[in-house]
Amino acid sequence: MSTFPASLLILNGKGANEPQLREAVNLLRDEGIDIHVRVTWEKGDAVRFIDEALQLNVETVIAGGGDGTINEVATALVERGSKMALGILPLGTANDFATSVGIPQDLASALKLAIVGRDVPIDIARVNDKTGFINMATGGFGTRITTETPEKLKAALGGVSYLIHGLMRMDTLKPDRCEIRGENFHWQGDALVIGIGNGRQAGGGQQLCPEALINDGLLHLRIFTGEELIPALFSTLANPENSPNIVDGVSSWFEITAPHEMTFNLDGEPLSGKTFRMELLPAALRCRLPPDCPLLR
């Protein structure tokens, strides 16, 4: 008889046939841990499985996939007002959130942490009162790259694929003119890259919001400004601390307005529009994380 409550593992269909994953699940089951497994086929499945998890009386719902899968499960838990904890099993291309919070790369270790690790309250962001992100919202150059990078290239090269595709597209990408407001913050101009982070990194390891914490009640903003991408990039790389092309801000909410349609990437999920309101919901979710997680204050 297991001393641990049952868990429900929600797998992105792309990672369901991973042999190491099957081995990790069977290993823990042999130890007496009760793990229910469900595989998503289309958008909305995660919400349905969480409703099932409530009926199964599990204490942890594990998101097995990339940043998009973690986002879908996390936002569904918050929308349902569930007290179940979120566990994380990194099976995606970039795994930005899992990497930044210190989830082990070894699947067996990650799965065990997701079930028996200590759960702590963390923040999550809501966007336009209908969707959200647990890690980061990115706009501009980075969003176009992650959206346009071919699936075959991502499968072959992982997070490096974003960099390669970005270098191929540098000469065609232009900035977005927009206005951004927050608590004691106002900026207007041409943005090459916008990062609004609950977490720190996106796009396969790019530290867009290096000071962000997931339990401080704040969103961290970083804007890379300028009209030409390559000169701005070289200026930033040469002297990041004093670069005139970087604007930082901190607030519990940000509003972005643009004269044209923009696209933000919310943990891998695109959202287009001319107006965005992003606000943090403090301590809205419980998540099983390593004891030395660097994103906790």
From Swiss-Prot:
Residues at which Mg(2+) binds: L213, D216, L218
GO cellular component: cytoplasm; plasma membrane
First-tier enzyme category under EC: transferase
Cofactor binding description: Binds 1 Mg(2+) ion per subunit. Ca(2+) may be able to substitute.
InterPro entries reported in the protein's UniProt record: ATP-NAD_kinase_N, Diacylglycerol/lipid_kinase, Diacylglycerol_kinase_cat_dom, Lip_kinase_YegS, Lipid_Phosphate_FormReg, NAD/diacylglycerol_kinase_sf, YegS/DAGK_C
Location relative to the cell: Cytoplasm
GO-annotated molecular function: ATP binding; lipid kinase activity; magnesium ion binding
SUPFAM superfamilies xrefs: NAD kinase/diacylglycerol kinase-like
Active-site residues from the entry: E269
GO biological process: phospholipid biosynthetic process
SMART domains: DAGKc (SM00046)
Main localisation: cytoplasm
Binding site for ATP: T40, G66, D67, G68, T69, I70, N71, E72, T93
Cofactor(s) needed by this chain: Mg(2+); Ca(2+)
Transmembrane intervals: none
HAMAP family: YegS
Task of the protein: Probably phosphorylates lipids; the in vivo substrate is unknown.
Family: Belongs to the diacylglycerol/lipid kinase family. YegS lipid kinase subfamily.
Record's protein name: Probable lipid kinase YegS-like
